[in-house]
């Protein structure tokens, strides 16, 4: 597969995961697509980005019930600090699988 095809596949995978992440608007805008392309060019793996979505969504959903509600995530850029955080982690994929299972217990926020 050529690099163009690989980038398109990466962008599609990342944007589809972003669209389905709890707490997001569920829509994709041009800046989101451009940022996904930049992440590909940086060499960030799609799995890393998906893990960042899971980590951020888990944090948002597993907050105290007394905490004020959070606004809707409107941009892929919201996740950049979490992507960088995930890049620096040295944890097993089991950790992210555990978070995914916890997220499945929460009702959809969209």
Segment roles from a protein language model:
Residues 2-110:
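Intrinsically disordered, low-complexity, basic-enriched segments
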